[in-house]
């Protein structure tokens, strides 16, 4: 299971089709494009985002950006588009 955080603040629980791990295709469908994985050491999990989200001018995701900055306080980066937060063991 993972949480899908949308730019408008909605949080949805999502589950892998095979009930074990998310496939690449599933992750790409959740973020609407190629994926980028960000390891979140403080939270001991990962964030999956759209690799080309900024280039595609996807909307700013405040909640996902807050999670990023909690894990990387010196970062000046930000998250756009949908973001999936999941345990590393949920990824294929």
Predicted segment positions?
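Domain-length accessory/inserted modules outside core catalytic folds
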Residues: 1-92
């Amino acid at each position: 299971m993972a949480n899908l955080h949308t730019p408008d603040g909605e949080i949805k629980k999502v589950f892998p089709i095979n009930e074990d791990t998310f496939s690449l295709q599933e992750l790409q469908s959740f973020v609407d494009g190629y994926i980028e994985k960000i390891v979140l050491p403080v939270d001991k999990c990962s964030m999956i985002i759209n690799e080309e989200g900024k280039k595609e001018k996807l909307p700013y995701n405040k909640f996902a950006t807050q999670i990023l900055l909690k894990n990387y306080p010196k970062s000046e980066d930000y998250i756009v588009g949908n973001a999936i937060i999941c345990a590393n063991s949920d990824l294929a």
